[in-house]
């Protein structure tokens, strides 16, 4: 694949669009989009493939803008009056027993010609007494493409659409037109909101930014990365895990692991919370859940991260459960099970994995626990993990030569990762607090940067440890360990 040719075609498409030659611009855009699509199929590196897909998406948006401009210009050439809303208030009262005046002959619709290959029903007008009638206007036959669609028709279309057809649309996008998620059957605002607020790219958190947790990293690589590298191996009984649940006390790195998955694995990352799938309208939340999973299958390979999943799918059958929340839970369970069933014999590189995190695993519904096949414990950092966390948090700060991070790691035993970060942050501010003590605001503003860049000492950590205590109790740790002994699946 000639990369220079791709760049040249993209440049020509943009130049023709700026000059107003939209037809030539659309031809170049279609060609470069097809070239990038073929190039992505030959790329094996997930990171490089993700960057090419992002470039392809940007060109696709430009192509859609040019296409909308062309359609707008074409609409000016059509001899058709604009459709204005009919105002019934200006119409005087009409007796229903009296027929309205006939439509002028020059405004009548042309007679429809019956063709032998298809049936066309003639346009019928109800001229009987029917209450108020709008002002007399030009009548047009309603073609098949202009037929108004009702909500019932949209629901039928959405219900009849299957995931395999959607996947073929994505893979077979050789014509350059079917390159974006088709939200037919759903509200356009819902689709745009999910694409704008949920799809996250490049959170800039890497595996090296997370200390310890080697078992969790290994499992996530096995569940997300390896199926993309070895698609022929992960088939049948070796199919990828469709659900992973991370359990542990607050501040141990569950959300950071999810961000690292989004950065390192090169998959589309959906970050879902309870507010994302909540709507005040009846039945809207269930549609959001279904739309989320359909978009995930379309943009596969995809990782759906549901943080604090106990707030969305808590135990069913309790006395304080609302009917609406029960319907949302049922739809979520159906879609999660459908993910595995739809992709069981498919290409593992087109997988959809649900990655969940919770601090209250004992409140999760039993059916959801079964669908989350891997349930791993994210514990408090070990002695080595605490030392690594100190090094990561203090890598941009100057340290005193006499300070020993191993000694500090022993003092912060029982602290979570978030607690250790707070200790490092507070200790790094101690020198600045001592320097500005007793100074006026003018004197503080006059201080140079070098005067504030003082090394962090062991005494600074001692003062910070006196102010900051651990946030996880021993009783909580016992509850997590007991639950993992009973339901863990690492």
From Swiss-Prot:
GO molecular-function term, one example from the UniProt record: microtubule severing ATPase activity
Task: Summarize where ATP binds, as residue positions.
Answer: 248-255
InterPro entries cross-referenced by the UniProt entry: AAA+_ATPase, AAA_lid_3, ATPase_AAA_core, ATPase_AAA_CS, KATNA1, KATNA1_MIT, Katnal1_chordates, KTNA1_AAA_dom
Low complexity: which segments have biased composition?
A: 128-139
Catalytic activity reads: n ATP + n H2O + a microtubule = n ADP + n phosphate + (n+1) alpha/beta tubulin heterodimers
Residues bearing N-acetylmethionine?
A: 1
List this protein's GO terms for biological process: microtubule severing; spermatogenesis
Which keywords does the record carry? Acetylation, ATP-binding, Cytoplasm, Cytoskeleton, Isomerase, Microtubule, Nucleotide-binding, Phosphoprotein
- Enzyme class, broadest EC rank: isomerase
Q: Quick one: where's region Disordered?
A: 95-178
Q: Which SMART domains match?
A: AAA
PTM sites of type Phosphoserine: 174
Q: Which residues form a coiled coil?
A: none
Q: What is its EC number?
A: 5.6.1.1
- Bias (Basic and acidic residues) occurs at 116-127, 143-169
Q: Where in the cell is it found?
A: Cytoplasm, Cytoskeleton; Cytoplasm; Cytoplasm, Cytoskeleton, Spindle pole; Cytoplasm, Cytoskeleton, Spindle
An example Gene Ontology cellular component term from the record? microtubule
Question: Which family would the database say this protein is a member of?
Answer: Belongs to the AAA ATPase family. Katanin p60 subunit A1 subfamily. A-like 1 sub-subfamily.
Described purpose of this protein according to its UniProt entry = Regulates microtubule dynamics in Sertoli cells, a process that is essential for spermiogenesis and male fertility. Severs microtubules in an ATP-dependent manner, promoting rapid reorganization of cellular microtubule arrays. Has microtubule-severing activity in vitro.
Q: How does it assemble?
A: Interacts with KATNB1 and KATNBL1.
Specify the protein name. Katanin p60 ATPase-containing subunit A-like 1
